[in-house]
Amino acid sequence: MTEIRLTNTKTRRKEAFEPIDRKNVRLYVCGPTVYDRAHLGNGRPVVVFDVLFRLLRHVYGESHVTYVRNFTDVDDKINAAALARKDAGDPRSLEALIRERTDETIRWYHEDMDALGALRPTHEPRATEWIGAMIAMIEDLIAKGHAYEREGHVLFRVRSYRDYGALSGRSVDDMIAGARVEVAPFKEDPMDFVLWKPSDDELPGWDSPWGRGRPGWHIECSAMSYELLGATFDIHAGGIDLQFPHHENEIAQSCCAHPEGGFAKVWMHNEMLLVDGRKMSKSLGNFFTIHDLRKDRGIPGEVIRMVLLGTHYSKPMDWTAEKAAQAKATLWKWRKLTADVEPAGSPDAAVLAALADDLNTPAAITRLHSIAAQEDGALLKASASLLGLLEDDLRGWTLPPAIATASNVIEVSGSATAIVGTVPYRKTIERLLDERKQARLGKDFKRSDAIRDLLVGAGVIIKDTPAGAEWDLGPDFDPARLGEPE
């Protein structure tokens, strides 16, 4: 069996992964707060840990991996969005507006992540469906002396958990000394954090032993992971921005509520995403939602996925238009190579080895380039599938109704791809290239340049060689632009 090695944030080492139960490998990834469309940075952990999910399924069997990714559907930002609609004159109840907003945002999220080629997790719990489990965990923490109630709030007693800060490498005393925020008067200690907070009458709330209120953010993941994966499970993952305080607080809550378990054995964190070398920000004009890239800029989801996988998850990833263009051109060539090919029975050993070595997706992609250079379409298709690439679903490619290659046409209907034997554009392209050749021989360079500009403008790639002009179709080929030159 393939040995998987993963970098464990908790131990700061790359370790051989040994599941608790090979028949049920368990993975939890923190999901989105569903108040607006997912931005490009939200897509990185989804794609990275989708590759991990695929790898685990390949090694241990599809039915032996349980993957949980939650939706946080109770949050101040969600409330604010619903209140804004209410203030704008919507007559419906705030509860109805919140439900509509969260349902709509989850639908958007699924559309975007499906387009990125991400498999759906085994479970996608909504926080509001697990309030009872959260209340039960909070009651248990109070009974064990790890939490206390003040003025309708329930707070976790941070100093009751001696290992607090171990994941992020922080000292509680140092954090207090460096704090620059006003401490709520009902806290015993500045580091204590909220497990439950009161809700105003107009805001969402649930009855509890401490009055009507709603859960704090951190308790949600602790309760849902316990209910769906147990007190101890294999891997907990998410973005590096969640390492502190969210993941640190999850560990404290879960280990104090269930000391018999160890919570997550392995912690994995993907690094941040930059755009053109800078932090993504609306004020800088470099903030993109995945929907923006797909719909407004016409970048296929598969292209976005390949760019995200081009940098190791443990390093900051820089999104640029140049990387997207390169990925698009590469995937176009690979899709043509594999269009009429059945995948090989197993992936390339070097691709599998790269992914098993701490999800080394850049090395895996480099190997895919080598396989493509050997024109082994069957092996390329099987191997790329481990990275969620070259799937039969076109993953957002916007293609003309018929794409000609030197020997066939790919006809696209919806998301299905079919190969047929006619070549409606080949003769046109070759006729134009022959006219260009004759114009050059006759030293009519104005006309030869016009023909070249016409072909290039239509998305035809031309390479002049001593033996004559060679051509191929680029990813932006549009037969409608194959008019006559001036």
Curated annotation (Swiss-Prot):
Q: Which domain of life is it from?
A: Bacteria
**Residues reported in the UniProt entry to bind ATP:** 282
Q: Which UniProt keywords are present, listed alphabetically? A: Aminoacyl-tRNA synthetase, ATP-binding, Cytoplasm, Ligase, Metal-binding, Nucleotide-binding, Protein biosynthesis, Zinc
State the GO CC annotations. cytosol
What catalytic activity is recorded? tRNA(Cys) + L-cysteine + ATP = L-cysteinyl-tRNA(Cys) + AMP + diphosphate
What is the uppermost EC class here? ligase
The record, for NCBIfam families, names: cysS (TIGR00435)
> So what family is this one in?
Belongs to the class-I aminoacyl-tRNA synthetase family.
Any idea what this protein is called?
A: Cysteine--tRNA ligase
The species this protein was found in: Cereibacter sphaeroides (strain ATCC 17029 / ATH 2.4.9) (Rhodobacter sphaeroides)
